């Protein structure tokens, strides 16, 4: 008996809705990354982009454990000499709460050519309202 290998044409995508209110950032990001990658499907194939769409709402109400609210920093470099910039988690949540979840999920996806395609299927919204009601997303509950 041969192993089944999914083809890109065979992939059927579903839409899922995740409420981030009161959830821990890392635990939620791992579950979202699993769905984006398609590992929850029995037809998972590593080299085929077979994941589903994920809509995350209430990104501004996500929590971190411990003192990370004050101690966690996001760092990036501008490319110029002395161009290392950093922004605290608290400031990031005030300015762009969607970026916090996107950054965490992106770090949990494989670092290859499929990553950007997987990230385009992640839609994050700061509040409870989202623009994908027409897709009838199925509510996805995590522990």
Swiss-Prot record:
Organism: Clostridioides difficile (strain 630) (Peptoclostridium difficile)
Protein name per Swiss-Prot or TrEMBL: Large ribosomal subunit protein uL13
Gene3D superfamilies: Ribosomal protein L13
InterPro entries attached to this UniProt entry: Ribosomal_uL13, Ribosomal_uL13_bac-type, Ribosomal_uL13_sf
Subunit structure comment from the entry: Part of the 50S ribosomal subunit.
GO biological process assignments: negative regulation of translation; translation
Pfam hit, one: Ribosomal_L13
Keyword line: Ribonucleoprotein, Ribosomal protein
GO function term, MF aspect, one: mRNA binding
Main function: This protein is one of the early assembly proteins of the 50S ribosomal subunit, although it is not seen to bind rRNA by itself. It is important during the early stages of 50S assembly.
GO cellular component terms listed in the entry, alphabetical order: cytosolic large ribosomal subunit
Family: Belongs to the universal ribosomal protein uL13 family.
Family matches, as NCBIfam families: rplM_bact
SUPFAM superfamilies: Ribosomal protein L13 (SSF52161)
